[in-house]
């Protein structure tokens, strides 16, 4: 991230040893006090933020919890741990890939990964790496490829295998 701060007078710290990110259902989030059904809406729970996922509320809410308070927060929220694979499967079904994307690095623009639809691109502010290309693609309405979810009805698909729709 330090590469992207340009000349801003900010410090970026790695706090991954102090905090953990967890997810709860949208229904559980809306059952908490002072919540709203708005993507990105944030509340504080014991000083830690809980927010409705800004990419899609179907993903539920995200919690950023201090590791020292994790067990107590889970208990107070009446949560039970689940297999994170379920979360990633739901994410992929919604067209929001989060794992297994390493091969796409430097080969695809954010706009081709649906970042605009996922509230990840703002065409009104700031500059960022790839902004010129992204703006040109948007302006000319020329998205030549797009990352989309699909359901395999029969069989299995191998990496780099061609996929056809109605033999085309």
Language-model segment annotations:
Residues 1-168:
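Basic, glycine/lysine-rich polyanion-binding surfaces/domains
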């Amino acid at each position: 991230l330090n590469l992207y701060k340009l000349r801003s007078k900010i410090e970026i710290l790695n706090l991954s040893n102090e905090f953990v990110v967890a997810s709860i259902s949208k229904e559980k989030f809306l059952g908490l006090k002072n919540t709203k059904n708005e993507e990105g809406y944030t509340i504080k729970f014991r000083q830690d933020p809980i927010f409705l996922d800004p990419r899609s509320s179907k993903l539920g809410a995200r919690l950023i919890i201090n590791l020292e308070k994790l067990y107590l927060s889970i208990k107070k929220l009446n949560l039970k741990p689940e297999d994170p694979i379920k979360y990633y499967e739901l994410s992929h079904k919604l067209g929001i890939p989060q794992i297994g994307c390493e091969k796409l690095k430097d080969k695809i623009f954010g706009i081709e990964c649906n970042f605009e639809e996922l509230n990840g691109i703002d065409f009104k502010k700031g500059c960022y790496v790839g902004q010129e290309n992204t703006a040109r693609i948007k302006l000319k309405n020329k998205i030549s490829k797009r990352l989309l979810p699909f359901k395999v009805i029969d069989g299995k698909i191998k990496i780099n295998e061609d996929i056809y729709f109605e033999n085309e």
